[in-house]
Amino acid sequence: MASAAEQLASNLNFSTFAKAEDLKKRLWFTLGALLVYRLGTYIPLPGLNPEAFAQAFQGQSGGILGLFNMFSGGAVQRMAIFALGIMPYISASIIVQLMTSVVPALEQLKKEGEQGRKIINQYTRYGTVLLGTAQAYAIAAGLESGNGLVNDPGWFFRISTVISLLGGTMFLMWLGEQITSRGIGNGISLIIFAGIVAHLPTALAGTLELGRTGALSTPLILAIIIMVVAVIALIVFVERAQRRLLIQYPKRQVGNRMFQGDTSHLPLKLNTSGVIPAIFASSLLLLPATLAGFANTATLPGWATTIVGALGHGKPLYMVLYGAMIAFFAFFYTAIVFNPKDTADNLKKHGGFIPGIRPGERTAEYIDYVLTRITVIGAVYLMFVCILPEVLISQTGVPFYLGGTSLLIVVSVTLDTVAQIQGHLIAQQYEGLIKKSKLRGGKRGR
């Protein structure tokens, strides 16, 4: 049996790609949308003093503000209209998904299929507007409290900043949805991916410059390269790993013919939640500290300054909260995307069963038992990948872009996008086979 790599090589050939017109249109649309996003990160907010802000950001870039800048694709560094990025949408998604688990009306909507999903998505958009407005106003007020950051402070600046930042977030939300429906891959993840990748050359150049000046020793740079390669290999391995449950189907009679029972597998991914826990945890941790970072620390209460300092990148409290949130969202998001009871009911409906397990409720309990245990492994893997490199990097001063979270997002989104491209190419091959069989059938009919 061919391996996944061999199947990918056989599907990703030039002749098949050249015939896949729909795939090419989707790829061009995705690239165009990401280009629009990158251009938007260079459009500055009106009324801001760019020189003063650049100087103020330079003093904060080594902290958590620099990490938020990575997720926004450099828009925070330039205080562009996309400075809020897609984080308000992600935060709203977290809140709405949590509410679907505790609010009966929303839980019922979730069970109504496509129509219910559209209503829940609309609630998420409303939540994005509310969160985006609050965060944009906090940024505007924080900028005004800075020394000389705003040319003409006042309500006009605050309103224009809120409109610009909120408009940027809503545009990115719409752009992400368009990429998902008309392009390739998950639009929201690709937007974050594009922001990180855009700054990878700068991070690599900065690391090499640190080595050239002697700030980083050659053995340390080699160790960092080995660590990055090892983390990438681990991510690829775990993201493709599966726990397969054997499914059997009994013999069945159709007319006068008896068909033998068939066997198949129910694949359970080791990391069912994917990259979502890292993105969710980052968004919740980054925003409060980032909003405080824009403000003048002299105007903050003592307790707020203490919390902001404790939540600094690489600090123990930051790592503990980050790991706890990753573990929570790994289990929470797995429960959202995979329902053992629905899977067991579908198996029972089609006559399938797990050997030694009674169909129905017992099958659902067994699937949940297996899924819970592999999710523990997935959560530990996510915490290891996201936290350990961050600890090492915080001790060496290497740019954030080489951290575990950014590597996880880049590799996971790349794997997901390549898998979707492969799916389109396979569909194109099947279409070609169907057309050939129809032509042969027509010739025989003549």
Annotated model-derived regions:
Residues A2-K110, Q115-R446:
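N-terminal cationic and glycine-rich segments that engage phosphates or anionic surfaces
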